[in-house]
Amino acid sequence: MKKILTILFLLFCLVLPVKADDNTKVVLPSETGLVENIKYEDAQGLNQGEETTKQVVTVKVLTGKFKGTERLIDNMLTGNPAYDINLTKGDKVVLHIEPLNDTVSTPDDVDIFIADIQRDNQIYVFTAVFFALLLFIGKKKGGTSIVSIISTMCLIFFVLMPMILHGFCPIASAVLVGILSTIITIYLVGGFNSKSSSAIIGTAISLIFAGGFSMLAIYFAHLTGFAGEENMFLYTARPDLSFTGILAASMIIAALGALMDTAVSIASTVNEIYETDKTLTVKQLFNSGMNVGRDIIGTMSNTLILVYLGSSLPLVLLSSNIDMNKFFNLNQVATEILSALIGSIAILFCVPITAIVAAYLIKKSSGNKVDFSELEKNEIS
């Protein structure tokens, strides 16, 4: 997920300067094409006379201004799967349309290149399956979860990214967006009540701690913010951005989901315990919340570490062929490890903070009994 957001952020950076700096340049959108035929030819490689394979691809444009146009496009296969686009007949591809003249009116005014295989249809299918299962299993809560997911994505794309691109502090921007996302998500799913308010306060304070610890980790570990090649591309497009700040922001956003989950679990537990026995004191409710929180700490911290470990599995496999001292001191390795640890530390803060806030707010609201089982009857505490 973190890499996806980085790539999308890079696209924002590449698009915005073009629109601002050159209003006369013709910029054409990418289009969809269909591979109708492929012929294979041997070709001279670019490196030391190595032999490579060339696919002479017949592509038909399926969308846009030049729909129906057919082109022969050379597709080089070097044997490196990281860069090769190995096509087969019937594949749908993304086409990059490059204008040759200041005005574009006919297919002869453009060059057409194969940018990549089209994968968005598969993404749409799995998204639809996910939403359908969410509605089928979650019922009403599933519907509110979908709304919260969409709202969070909108906050990231239309609030966080523009704020960073326009020079706002990435850390403050990430904390602000994280708090807004928390408010929307928890109130939508849990209703307006003291339980939800407790979870929001616990998450918000923990996010601030995550921001502070991320700054400390980056400063003392001398992290550069350049942990992958996408960061180098971003630097080429926008060298004015704070890459250490962007790294800290990514740590904060990555920890957000686990923090919300932890806070909601603790607040819900404290609320259920109090509903069972209303004679319990704030201290007793706090202790109950801490007991549950201690169980949550292990699983949620493990979840964060496994997420980072899974996304960096090739990097982990690299450790078998490199000195361990050198491996753990690599910038990319240190970045991934510290990111997981920052999220885990934030969870540790989230447990006692949410427990004490929930114990106090839920006990305080006992004068007005709130039925938490019926969200439509909830009132703002």
How would you name each of these model-derived features?
Residues 16-20:
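Sec/Tat signal peptide C-region and signal peptidase I cleavage site
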Residues 127-234, 241-254:
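Transmembrane alpha-helical segments that form the functional core of multipass membrane systems
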